[in-house]
Amino acid sequence: MNKTVAVRTLDPENLGQGGVQKEEIPSADISDQVPGTESETKILLQGTPVAQMTEDAIDGERLKHLIVTGSGCGEQNMIAMTHTVIAVHYLDHTEQWDKFSLEKRQEALELIKKGYTQQLAFKQPNSAYAAFLNRAPSTWLTAYVVKVFSLAVNLIAIDSQVLCGAVKWLIMEKQKPDGVFQEDAPVIHQEMIGGQRNSVEKERALTAFVLIALQEAREICEEQVNSLAASINKSRDFLAANYMNLQRPYSVAIAAYAWAQQDKLRGAFLNKFLSKAKEKNRWEEPGQRLYNVEASSYALLALLLLRDFDSVPPVVRWLNEQRYYGGGYGSTQATFMGFQALAQYQTDVPDHKDLNMVVSIQLPSRSSPVKHRIVWDSASLLRSEETKENQGFSLTAQGKGQGTLSVVTTYFAKVKGKVTCKKFDLRVNIKTAPETVKKPQDAKSTMILGHCTRYLGDEDATMSILDISMMTGFVPDTDDLNLLSTGVDRYISKYELNKAFSNKNTLIIYLDKISHSREECLAFKVHQYFNVGLIQPGAVKVYSYYNLEETCTQFYHPEKEDGMLSKLCHKEMCRCAEENCFMQQLDEKITLNDRLDKACEPGLDYVYKTKLVQVERADDFDEYLMVVENTIKSGSDEVQAGQPAPFISHIKCRDALKLKDGKHYLMWGLSSDPVGEKPNTSYIIGKDTWVEFWPEKEECQDEENQKHCEDLGAFAESMVVFGCPN
């Protein structure tokens, strides 16, 4: 897993002393690390406020992820188009195309043209927009089309009648006499509306949103829409009458920007706006990171219009620090508004060419500090250092300008407790198909895979993905999938079948929505085309396309109710634990010679008398912490008497082992059982591990235990004194 250790703003002139900024970075808390595995810490440096998401989107692997050809319904197409428009807008305003290429700018413009053309397919006769032509038009979506098209008008040719027709519909059909804009047909993809999704102060926030869109289209449409100026004034007056009663920082920020566009944000209104800023750098609602990015971006735009350049830098720094490791802001509105605000900032405050900073990193594992110079020309370059040591370190920054430091530690974490599903409930089952079901001639067997899922939010989930890995040797029936995707009921949007690197197929199913009020179930046949010795389980994962944290995974297998994977993993190597559970030795007929023969077999590594002192239950394995009380035969790991040693066993072996806290056990195992580097060695309990109860001294007084205790004592003495005969 990845754990963010620290995100710091580097600004020596403002945050340092005497022009030198010192930062102490702690070590990561990796107390849940899998024993014997390594960790890696990455230290990332970058100039501010150059945006990593934009660069990744235009140049590199994230091109396909963030800048895509528009597709889907009228809402999905706008979601796809948003990133491309804002990326080009940002790079144009910051004059950074020389760092990419004009060819790539042209490619991005072609994508915008395609998105624009496809959006026109959802323009209704009244010039409004909805997800589908037969659906009632949406106020918010139509206003958002106006907003995006107004920004894109400087990039591609956009018909002013298309843009202004939407403006006219908003005014004539959706504005009340008091200036309020009403929504009668909310969008299906609620996640695309950002902070507007909150039901508190929804009417006022929507009115501010539409008002901003109208003002951004004013220069284009004022001559075509005679009532535009009057409409803007009515909405402005409505917000003025209600502004002092607003409570949400989001509502305060978006309304403030709408007011600042008309140079009306003054006096008590300005004080109200500034008072909602937490620590003078963000307009924040607890637990709503993306809403906060969006709201703070509106606030930054308002501050820029006010020319309040003393208040601007802290907001820019906070926005920049919200970039998480590996990607951008992560939502339609947060991304769009974030980069619109940052682009405007770099246009209005063009002082970044003064960026010239030296960062010195002192890692404990290195004798001399590592130095990086960050200058304007290479501000976008992501500089990184890596270390295998999980230790705190110090850093100093000197010079002019701003930068961002991110520290992330990657390590293998134990899966503790039951895996929880976030926002989705998922049930999976697989059963043998009835004899009457037709199967391909060369199929060995046919089964039916079914899964039912429900979204646990307050509204239906919009576009969601089912990621299904097939069991070994099985493939899905494409005829069934085609019926599901093209039939009269059309249960799924589309599907993709990919051959994975292993011998297992992966099926991706796209769903337009998942109900929050009832389970939605799908089933299709899967065929086994070749037999394998051990059928490994498959998995079904459901997740939200626009919020990857909302997810649930369940395993399936024809012979296992929960489909749990029976394996133990260390680094990239996994050991199959299927049918490898060791039965604790309870046979009273075991003799001294039996133990000597077994303990001296080739490949046997260690023989210990141990005491179980602690048990940790994880999701797929148990960890038994044993204290080695007597090293009857030293192993390659060189454990000393009195030293603790963790033994790991698959959860399915728990009942077979029957180990009890505080009890003693005779244990031995193969040389391949210890894993990990000293002193973090762990031991795998497999089918060749010997585990035998060793009674306590008082228990040895009982007649039934006397012979057992004598044999164990004689065994230990013989091994210590004489060793193995071979």
UniProtKB/Swiss-Prot annotation:
User: Where is it found, in Gene Ontology cellular component terms?
Assistant: extracellular space
Glycosylation site positions? 2, 233, 680
Q: How does it assemble?
A: In absence of complement activation, the C3 precursor is first processed by the removal of 4 Arg residues, forming two chains, beta and alpha, linked by a disulfide bond.
Region described as Disordered? 1-21
Q: List the disulfide bonds.
A: 581-653, 600-724
Q: Does the keyword Isomerase apply?
A: no
Please name the SUPFAM superfamilies in this protein's record: Alpha-macroglobulin receptor domain, Terpenoid cyclases/Protein prenyltransferases, TIMP-like
What does the entry's PTM section describe?
C3 precursor is first processed by the removal of 4 Arg residues, forming two chains, beta and alpha, linked by a disulfide bond. During activation of the complement systems, the alpha chain is cleaved into C3a and C3b by the C3 convertase: C3b stays linked to the beta chain, while C3a is released in the plasma. The alpha chain is cleaved by the serine protease complement C2b component of the C3 convertase to generate C3a and C3b following activation by the classical, lectin and GZMK complement systems.
Please list the coiled coil stretches: none
Q: What name does UniProt use for this protein?
A: Complement C3 alpha chain
Please list the residue ranges annotated as the NTR domain: 581-724
Swiss-Prot/TrEMBL puts the cross-link Isoglutamyl cysteine thioester (Cys-Gln) at: 73-76
Q: One biological-process term from Gene Ontology?
A: complement activation, classical pathway
Q: Which PROSITE patterns match?
A: ALPHA_2_MACROGLOBULIN, NTR
Q: Where is this site: Coordinates Mg(2+) for interaction with Complement factor B Bb fragment (CFB)?
A: 726
- What's this protein's function? Precursor of non-enzymatic components of the classical, alternative, lectin and GZMK complement pathways, which consist in a cascade of proteins that leads to phagocytosis and breakdown of pathogens and signaling that strengthens the adaptive immune system.
Q: Give the regulation of activity.
A: Complement activation is inhibited by VSIG4.
Q: What is its main location?
A: secreted
User: Annotated region Interaction with CFP/properdin: where?
Assistant: 697-722
The organism encoding this protein is Oryctolagus cuniculus
